[in-house]
Amino acid sequence: MSDIKRQFDHMVAGLNYDCLDAELRTLRASARLACAKYNAHPSAGNMKHITRLFKAVGSAVLEPGFQCDYGVNIEVGYNFYANFHCVLLDAAPIVIGDDVLLGPHVHIYTSDHPKDAEQRKQGVCFAKAVHIRDNVWIGGGAKILSGVTIGEGAIVGANAVVSKDIPAFTTYSLLFPHH
């Protein structure tokens, strides 16, 4: 098995991996190029530059400014809408259900870094999947951190930072941080 296969497999499995690996950097560069092509000339026809990267897509609208790390670890259901300048860092799977709305500047991060500075200097990273169930609305500027599941029908308020699971049919915001 090649080193890239091991690094990619480790990354997706949530194990430590070398984020400075040349082949992973090449995959990220390809995704950035696809995003740049779409963002330079946003249209339904040009959105294919991004969605063809995705592991699976039901139906999606991606407003300009969309960015992703790899794309290949993103799955979206039907009626997915990402408002302007959304960022999905998909070192691990990001699985998004049907009828999900992301406000502008929503960021979803699967990547994380060790607390040890020496490991960080060496490019050690790890990633955990993010799951967003059906009928979720995430308000503008919210940040979803690695390993989080947001339950069906939940609402995440604007500018919230979500570091723990959100139960189904609850609201989580800066004003109401307790489910």
Residue ranges, per PLM feature:
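Terminal amphipathic alpha-helical/low-complexity segments used for targeting or macromolecular assembly
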Residues: M1-S59
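Flexible, glycine/small-residue-enriched loop-and-beta-strand segment within the central core
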Residues: F66-V76, Y81-I150, L175-H179
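Arg/Lys-rich RNA-binding interfaces used to dock onto structured RNA substrates
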Residues: G58-Q67
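Tight coil/turn sites that cap or link beta-strands
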Residues: G141, G153, N159, F169-T170
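C-terminal end-helix/capping segment
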Residues: V162, I166-H179
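Gly/lys/ser-thr-rich phosphate-binding loops in alpha/beta enzymes
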Residues: M1-I4, N159, P167
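Extended beta-solenoid/beta-helix repeat architectures
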Residues: K55, V148-G151, I166
